UniProtKB/Swiss-Prot annotation:
Pathway: Cofactor biosynthesis; adenosylcobalamin biosynthesis; adenosylcobalamin from cob(II)yrinate a,c-diamide: step 7/7
Organism per entry: Leptospira interrogans serogroup Icterohaemorrhagiae serovar Lai (strain 56601)
Compartments it resides in: Cell inner membrane
ATP-binding recorded as keyword: no
Upper classification of the organism: Bacteria, Pseudomonadati, Spirochaetota, Spirochaetia, Leptospirales
Entry keyword Endoplasmic reticulum: no
GO biological process, one term: cobalamin biosynthetic process
Protein name per the record: Adenosylcobinamide-GDP ribazoletransferase
InterPro entries linked: CobS
Family: Belongs to the CobS family.
Cellular-component GO terms for this entry: plasma membrane
Biological role stated in the UniProt entry: Joins adenosylcobinamide-GDP and alpha-ribazole to generate adenosylcobalamin (Ado-cobalamin). Also synthesizes adenosylcobalamin 5'-phosphate from adenosylcobinamide-GDP and alpha-ribazole 5'-phosphate.
Length: 265
């Protein structure tokens, strides 16, 4: 297998893992490919953002902003299969109702949603809706660029958690386990490029917005390092659901950082 085909397979594996979109052509499965595909998680964020934010933007030509935002959020869930939202709900249920590592991990594996998960989803989706509406009213271009770097950087922060603490399920045989292990240095550097380039480009286009973006990164960093300690204390590591929780949380914090900064001007 040549190098180009190998990289394509890694990207396709990441595509399949993070979205419900059709399988890309010329993909050849192998576990070695799967194990290094997480380097492209932030790049998948570019694709999800492009599909949802530009659909919202074009819908706003014929529909009220609020309805366009709702439809864009629905499209995001359809593209990803609610993958990260499911992780957020499972973490809320598990840590809200569990009192030991074994019980927390058991609740996470339960496919049913409970009270804490429902509350977490309602609050996070409601906050996301309000923040996106506010960003769009500030400027459609601010909305588009913020969506781009928030989707990519939030997935990078999920990878950062993987680098900081071990996987919590020692004997897990799930198909996703090969994807959720520490990245080699080059892979993490590549994911950092895909995760941070949109923010750098945003600053290039809006050079007076450095404090806004830095606030988002600052809030997200505090969030990740707090939950690194929290997860390590209770389950001695992370699970795939923890990564979804981190992605959703940091995405919201980027939206919040830009919103706070703009409304303080």
């Amino acid at each position: 297998m040549n190098k180009l085909q190998e990289e394509w397979n890694r990207f396709c594996a990441s595509w399949m893992f993070n979205t419900r979109l059709p399988i890309l052509p010329f993909y050849v499965y192998s576990e070695s490919t799967l194990s290094r595909s997480s380097r492209y998680f932030p790049l998948i964020g570019w694709i999800v953002s492009a599909g949802t934010s530009y659909s919202t933007y074009f819908l706003s030509w014929i529909l009220p902003i609020e309805i366009s935002i709702i439809l864009g959020m629905i499209l995001s869930v359809l593209i990803t299969g609610g993958f990260h939202e499911d992780g957020l709900a499972d973490v809320c249920d598990a840590f809200g109702g569990g009192w030991s590592k074994e019980k927390i991990l058991e609740i996470m594996k339960d496919s049913r949603i409970g009270t804490f998960g429902s509350i977490g989803l309602i609050l996070s989706l409601g906050l996301k809706y309000l923040l996106l509406v506010n960003l769009f009213k500030i400027s459609p271009w601010i909305f588009l660029f913020t969506s781009w770097f928030s989707h990519s950087a939030s997935r990078w922060f999920a990878l950062l958690l993987m680098m900081l603490i071990p996987y919590a399920r020692e004997n897990d045989l799930s198909k996703s386990k090969p994807m959720i292990k520490k990245l080699p240095p080059f892979d993490f550097a590549l994911s950092t490029f895909f995760g941070c380039f949109p923010a750098v480009y945003f600053l290039y286009q809006f050079q007076n917005q450095i404090p806004n973006v830095l606030l988002g990164f600052f809030l997200s960093s505090i969030f990740v390092f707090y939950f690194r300690n929290y997860f390590n204390k209770w389950i001695e590591g992370f699970t795939g659901d923890c990564l979804g929780f981190i992605q959703q949380g940091t995405e919201l914090l980027f939206y919040l950082g830009i919103t706070v900064s703009w409304n303080s001007i």
